[in-house]
Each structure stands twice: as C-alpha cells, then as structure tokens.
C-alpha cells in the first residue's frame, strides 16, 4: 500500500514539475481540516496567461482573491468544491484539481493538487 501511495506522490510531483516548468513559486497549497488554500500564478498552465474567470478549484469553485498579474487565490472549506478527503493512518489527504477552461477557445487543462493534514493526537 505504501508503495502505491509513493508512486502516486511521484506522479503528482512529476505533473507539478512539468506543468510549472520548474517554477516552484507558481503554486502554493496549504490546508487544515477546516480550510483548503491554493495560490497560483496566472501563467501556471504552460506559461499561458489565464484570467481569473477561466480557472477553477475542483468542481467549479471560483477564485476568491485576485492580485492582478501576480496571483489568484482559492480559499474554501474541505467539504466544498468536490475536494476529496481521504483518511490515512496518521494523516488526512485532501485531493482536488485546478481546472482551466478558456473562454475564447476550446482549450482546457487540469492539474491535480493534494495536501496532507497531520492528525492531532489527544493527550
């Protein structure tokens, strides 16, 4: 089971590297059991500039904050947007995707996102 999770992690990492062309600042993901946060650059998809109304989190959740030409932010509860919460032994794995749907053409693209929440142990 750990091997499968390791391969999935490598696949996600490879997808992130390929999509962002090595620019690690192109995306940031943070989460807790109460919120999911993603910040992306407008050029995250193949250095093609995307407008905030063309990019979505999960099942169609819109950008929640824009700093023009710098970044777009998504801030949602983990039960929103079709975010999948997968409980594992010591952690919760939150999985979703960033979707790009061009308003001027048929171009579409997706990038998987995941975030790990460490479970708090009661003492």
Swiss-Prot record:
It is found in: Secreted. Belongs to the PLAC1 family. InterPro entries: PLAC1_fam. Keywords: Secreted, Signal. The lineage of its organism: Eukaryota, Metazoa, Chordata, Craniata, Vertebrata. Residues 1-26 form the signal peptide. May be involved in cell differentiation. This is Putative oocyte-secreted protein 1 homolog. One of its GO terms (cellular component) is extracellular region. Gene3D superfamilies: Zona pellucida, ZP-N domain.
């Amino acid at each position: 089971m750990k091997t499968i999770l390791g391969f999935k992690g490598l696949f996600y990492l490879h997808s992130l590297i390929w999509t962002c062309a090595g620019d690690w600042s192109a995306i940031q993901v943070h989460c807790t059991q109460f919120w999911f946060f993603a910040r992306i650059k407008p050029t995250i998809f193949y250095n093609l500039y995307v407008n905030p109304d063309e990019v979505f989190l999960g099942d169609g959740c819109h950008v929640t904050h824009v700093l023009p030409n710098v970044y777009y932010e998504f801030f949602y509860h983990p039960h929103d947007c079709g975010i999948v919460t997968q409980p594992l032994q010591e952690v919760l794995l939150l999985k979703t995707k960033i979707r790009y749907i061009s308003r001027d053409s048929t171009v579409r693209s997706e990038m998987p996102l995941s975030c790990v929440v460490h479970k708090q142990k009661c003492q």
